[in-house]
C-alpha cells in the first residue's frame, strides 16, 4: 500500500470540514491505490480519518467517500444525481440510462425494460440462444486442459453479446477489434490527435453506433422477428414518449459494455472459487447431475439453488462494480455529517459487500448464506446491481447466463472426469477500478 501512496504528501487537511486522505500524487491523485489496492485504502482511510473522507480520483477530481452504512441510501435519494457519471466518462456513457435521472431516465427505461424481464427474455428465446454457445466454449476448455481464465470468460461474454445482437459469425473479428478500441475511451487522455487512444476510441464508437443503427433499421423492417434487440426496438417504438434513436443506440451500446466486462469478471471469479474450494465444486456437480441439462428459461432457475448461490456469493465477495459516483443536488445529512449541495460523492459498494455490519462472517465465501435463507432477497443483498430507480436493467439476464454457465461447466467437466484446479496465485494482479477483475494471467487447469 505504501508504494501506491505519495510519501511526500502527508499533510492533513480538510475540505468542507471533512478530512482529505493524504498520499495523493500530482495529476493521478489516489488512483494507483484505488486501482490496485482499494480494499486496503478504504480500511486505512476509515481507521485514520473516520467514516467520511475525500479521495482524489485524478482527472475526475475529489469525491467525498462515505463508508457509513447510511451511504447506501444515497442510491435511492431524490436529491442525489447520477449525472456525474456522464461527466466522468462522457465518451462512453453520455446519453445512457446510468447517467440519467428523473423523467428522462424513466422514459428511456420504461421504453426498453420489458425486454429484460424474465417473461421478455423467455419469449425472445435468450436461454435457448445462449446454451449451445456456452456448452461449446466449456467443451473447448475441457479439450485444451487448461486456460487463462479471464481472457477466456471475456471472449465468451463477447460471443454471447454478439450472438444476442445477431452479429454474423464472419463479422465477429471486426467487432472484437472495434470493441477493444472502444474500451480505450475509459482511460484515454483528453488529447485528440491521430493514432492516440481518444481518436481511435471515438472512431470505434462511431463505427459501432453505425452498425447498431442498421440493427435498429433491420428490426423495424422485420417487426415479426423475435430476439432481444427486436424486442427492445419494438418496445421503444411503442413508447408514449417521443424518444430519439440516439437514445436507443446509446443504450444498446451500454448493453454491450455492461454485459461484457463486469459479467466476464464475475464468471472468472466463479471458476476460481470452484477451483480453490473442492466442496463447492462437488455441490455444484451434484446439482447439475440432478438437473441434467443447462436451464434455458427463468422458470427453470429455481431448480438450481447452488448455482444461484454461487452467482450471488461471487458477486458479494468480488463485486465487479466497486464504486458509484453521485452528486448531491441539495444539502444532505449523511450519518453525522452535513454534506453541501453540489458535493461529488463516492459510494463504495466494495466496502458494503464485505461489511460485518451487513453480513455475517463477511470475509468467508459461504453458499450457505443464500441456501439457508428464508427471507426474500433484500436490496442490500444485490447492491452490486444498484437499487432504486437505477437498479441494473440487465439483472435477470446476468442471473440467467451465469447459472447457465455454472451448470454447463459442471456437466461438461464431470462427464470427462475432471475438475477445475488453480494453477497460479490469485491475489497478485487484481484490479478494482474502473471495474474490478482478477489478474489477467490466472490459469485454471481441468484434470
Curated annotation (Swiss-Prot):
Gene Ontology process terms (BP): sterol metabolic process
Primary role: Cytochromes P450 are a group of heme-thiolate monooxygenases. They oxidize a variety of structurally unrelated compounds, including steroids, fatty acids, and xenobiotics.
Family: Belongs to the cytochrome P450 family.
Gene3D superfamilies, A to Z: Cytochrome P450 (1.10.630.10)
Pfam family, one: p450
GO molecular function: heme binding; iron ion binding; monooxygenase activity; oxidoreductase activity, acting on paired donors, with incorporation or reduction of molecular oxygen
Residues the record lists as binding heme: 392
EC number: 1.14.14.-
Name of the molecule in the record: Cytochrome P450 BJ-4 homolog
Cofactor(s) demanded: heme
Domain of life: Bacteria
Record's keyword terms, sorted: Heme, Iron, Metal-binding, Monooxygenase, Oxidoreductase, Plasmid
UniProt source species: Sinorhizobium fredii (strain NBRC 101917 / NGR234)
The protein's enzyme class: oxidoreductase
Amino acid at each position: 500500500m505504501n508504494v501506491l501512496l505519495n510519501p511526500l504528501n502527508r499533510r492533513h487537511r480538510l475540505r468542507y470540514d471533512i478530512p482529505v486522505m493524504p498520499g495523493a500524487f500530482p495529476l493521478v491523485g489516489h488512483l494507483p491505490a484505488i486501482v490496485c489496492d482499494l480494499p486496503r485504502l478504504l480500511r486505512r482511510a476509515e481507521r485514520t480519518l473516520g467514516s467520511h473522507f475525500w479521495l482524489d480520483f485524478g482527472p475526475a477530481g475529489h469525491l467525498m467517500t462515505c463508508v457509513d452504512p447510511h451511504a447506501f441510501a444515497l442510491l435511492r435519494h431524490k436529491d442525489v444525481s447520477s449525472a456525474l457519471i456522464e461527466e466522468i466518462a462522457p465518451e462512453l456513457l453520455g446519453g445512457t440510462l446510468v447517467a440519467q435521472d428523473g423523467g428522462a431516465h424513466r422514459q428511456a427505461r420504461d421504453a426498453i425494460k420489458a425486454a429484460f424481464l424474465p417473461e421478455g427474455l423467455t419469449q425472445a428465446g435468450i436461454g435457448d440462444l445462449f446454451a449451445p454457445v456456452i456448452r461449446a466454449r466449456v467443451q473447448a476448455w475441457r479439450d485444451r486442459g487448461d486456460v487463462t481464465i479471464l481472457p477466456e470468460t471475456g471472449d465468451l461474454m463477447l460471443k454471447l453479446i454478439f450472438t444476442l445482437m445477431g452479429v454474423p459469425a464472419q463479422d465477429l473479428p471486426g467487432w472484437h477489434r472495434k470493441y477493444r478500441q472502444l474500451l480505450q475511451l475509459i482511460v484515454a487522455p483528453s488529447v485528440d490527435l491521430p493514432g492516440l487512444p481518444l481518436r481511435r476510441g471515438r472512431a470505434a464508437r462511431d463505427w459501432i453506433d453505425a452498425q447498431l443503427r442498421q440493427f435498429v433499421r433491420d428490426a423495424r423492417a422485420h417487426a415479426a422477428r423475435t430476439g432481444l434487440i427486436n424486442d427492445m426496438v419494438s418496445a421503444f417504438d411503442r413508447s408514449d414518449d417521443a424518444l430519439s434513436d440516439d437514445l436507443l443506440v446509446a443504450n444498446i451500446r451500454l448493453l454491450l459494455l455492461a454485459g461484457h466486462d463486469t459479467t466476464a469478471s464475475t464468471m472468472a471469479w466463479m471458476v476460481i472459487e470452484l477451483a480453490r474450494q473442492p466442496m463447492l465444486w462437488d455441490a455444484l456437480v451434484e446439482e447439475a447431475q440432478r438437473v441434467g441439462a443447462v436451464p434455458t428459461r427463468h422458470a427453470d432457475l429455481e431448480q438450481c439453488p447452488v448455482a444461484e448461490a454461487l452467482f450471488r456469493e461471487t458477486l458479494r465477495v468480488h463485486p465487479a462494480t466497486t464504486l458509484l459516483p453521485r452528486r448531491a443536488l441539495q444539502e444532505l445529512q449523511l450519518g453525522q455529517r452535513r454534506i453541501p449541495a453540489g458535493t461529488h460523492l463516492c459510494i463504495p459498494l466494495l466496502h458494503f459487500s464485505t461489511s460485518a455490519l451487513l453480513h455475517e462472517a463477511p470475509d468467508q465465501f459461504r453458499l450457505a448464506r443464500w441456501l439457508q435463507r428464508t427471507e426474500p432477497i433484500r436490496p442490500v443483498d444485490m447492491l452490486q446491481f444498484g437499487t432504486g430507480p437505477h437498479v441494473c436493467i440487465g439483472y435477470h439476464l446476468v442471473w440467467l447466463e451465469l447459472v447457465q454457465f455454472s451448470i454447463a461447466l459442471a456437466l461438461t467437466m464431470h462427464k470427462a472426469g475432471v475438475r477445475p484446479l488453480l494453477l497460479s496465485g490469485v491475489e497478485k494482479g487484481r484490479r478494482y477500478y474502473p471495474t474490478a477483475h482478477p489478474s489477467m494471467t490466472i490459469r485454471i487447469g481441468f484434470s
